[in-house]
């Protein structure tokens, strides 16, 4: 196997199943000479099983021959927390005003989802991190 020379890494957050050539995708990939339509088709195919509109972080590796590969990550913890608590946005004053509640079981489920991206960390430490995120968006964590 021939090792390709890496030209660039591009990090984007794209809605699942909704990649299209418009900004920010088009300019970011076009600048590196990547076939934008090909990427959009591959990304949409890859994220078809996910909920449409869920923001998915993606790292695109562009090679010197203008080919590419990409890795999709799990949605941000704040998005998963807001979805679990059934709220649209976080609190303007997180430590003073709570906008919702979330159970420890829900925190654990989100931690299991995020564990895929956080290699080397155990579920307990990931759960603590997610509890911190929950508090920072104004969610009360219940046992």
From Swiss-Prot:
Alphabetical keyword list: Methylation, Ribonucleoprotein, Ribosomal protein, RNA-binding, rRNA-binding
Gene Ontology CC terms: cytosolic large ribosomal subunit
CDD domains linked to this entry: Ribosomal_L11 (cd00349)
InterPro entries, sorted: Ribosomal_uL11, Ribosomal_uL11_bac-typ, Ribosomal_uL11_C, Ribosomal_uL11_C_sf, Ribosomal_uL11_CS, Ribosomal_uL11_N, Ribosomal_uL11_N_sf
GO biological process per UniProt: translation
SMART domains documented for this protein: RL11
SUPFAM superfamilies: Ribosomal L11/L12e N-terminal domain, Ribosomal protein L11, C-terminal domain
GO molecular function, one term: large ribosomal subunit rRNA binding
Free-text function comment from the UniProt entry: Forms part of the ribosomal stalk which helps the ribosome interact with GTP-bound translation factors.
Similarity comment text for this entry: Belongs to the universal ribosomal protein uL11 family.
PANTHER family: 60S RIBOSOMAL PROTEIN L12, LARGE RIBOSOMAL SUBUNIT PROTEIN UL11M
Quaternary structure (record): Part of the ribosomal stalk of the 50S ribosomal subunit. Interacts with L10 and the large rRNA to form the base of the stalk. L10 forms an elongated spine to which L12 dimers bind in a sequential fashion forming a multimeric L10(L12)X complex.
Protein's name in the database: Large ribosomal subunit protein uL11
Source lineage: Bacteria, Pseudomonadati, Pseudomonadota, Gammaproteobacteria, Enterobacterales
